[in-house]
Each structure stands twice: as C-alpha cells, then as structure tokens.
C-alpha cells in the first residue's frame, strides 16, 4: 500500500490539518482504515490516536482509493469537533480474548 498526498491544508481555528490522499493498494483488497491511519501517522510524525479518516472511497476499476483525513493537535480537541460515530470508527483498541 502506498499513500500519495493530494492536498494538505492547515485549519488553525479547529487546530487540525485536513488532508486529501490517494491510497494505491495494488493487487490486494482495499486497505482498512486502521492501516491507512497508521501509515499516515508515520508519514506525518503524529500519533495514530490523533488521525481521523473521515471517508474513504474506492474508485471503480482502479486499484486506488481517495481518502479524506484529519490530524488533530490533541485527542480532547478531536472529541470536541468530530461526530461521535466518526471517532468510534477511528478508535482502534486491542481486544483481548478471554481464556
């Protein structure tokens, strides 16, 4: 999976960066939100918990997707601004199996 940033804009009022990116997934399936969040966080030197993938659309007949992401300065600000269902989609916790 490769990520190409199409546009990036700073939003000082909401204390976030708004990014449109192209996700090139080659022969494999469409990548998960989690993998896109982790990769974008690594590229932009941010924590994965501060990155929100708002939407991700696969293009028909092409092996790429267009994603809209936001990187917040703090988790508190993210929870104030984003809708609860979007935050829930982007919070990835490790589930422990009961043994």
UniProtKB/Swiss-Prot annotation:
Entry-linked InterPro entries: Nucleotide-bd_a/b_plait_sf, Ribosomal_eS24, Ribosomal_uL23/eL15/eS24_sf
PANTHER family in UniProt: 40S RIBOSOMAL PROTEIN S24
Keyword Ribonucleoprotein attributed: yes
Listed Pfam families: Ribosomal_S24e
Official protein name in the record: Small ribosomal subunit protein eS24
Alphabetical keyword list: Ribonucleoprotein, Ribosomal protein
Keyword field contains Ribonucleoprotein: yes
GO molecular function: structural constituent of ribosome
Gene that this sequence comes from: rps24e
Gene Ontology CC: one annotated term: ribosome
Gene3D superfamilies on file: 3.30.70.330
Gene Ontology process terms (BP): translation
Recorded family membership: Belongs to the eukaryotic ribosomal protein eS24 family.
Lineage: Archaea, Methanobacteriati, Methanobacteriota, Stenosarchaea group, Methanomicrobia
Organism whose genome encodes this protein: Methanothrix thermoacetophila (strain DSM 6194 / JCM 14653 / NBRC 101360 / PT)
Domain of life: Archaea
